[in-house]
Amino acid sequence: MNECGGTDIRLFAKIENRRGMDALAELLPHADEIVIARGDLGNAVPLWELPAVQKRIAARCRENGTPFMVVTQMLASMEHSRVPTRAEMSDIFNAVLDGAASVMVTGETAAGEYPADVIRYLALAAHAAETFLKENGI
């Protein structure tokens, strides 16, 4: 982007299918952040493989020093429930432990009944993970 004169613009590359996974090495030097789009990826790979795919992409991003974002169904139950599931809290915690620079919610705040609670729980889980990392010297 610098060579185009747009130094204030951040570029995000969304990985949403096998083609994106295959192109990751090419994208890493050029993207400011990689978006691990689990909803789309979950349609491209068997669901039981999705966690490993997420971990592999995260590892490649860390190796390259490229920030990454984890998105899709972080707190999906909260579209209609005031309290998240334990699995959702663990998911956010683990995304932060894996080095995510960002976690993003979509439907939870766009169409959900408790958008402020969603952000509160998202922040609580992310903060707990950051605290865990600091306390354990990770």
Predicted regions and their residues:
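C-terminal helical cap(s) of enzyme catalytic domains, especially alpha/beta-barrels
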Residues: 53, 108-134
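Short coil/turn segments at secondary-structure boundaries
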Residues: 137-138
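Conserved alpha/beta-domain cores
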Residues: 1-72, 78-98, 110
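Conserved beta-strand positions in the central sheet of alpha/beta enzyme cores
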Residues: 35, 104-105
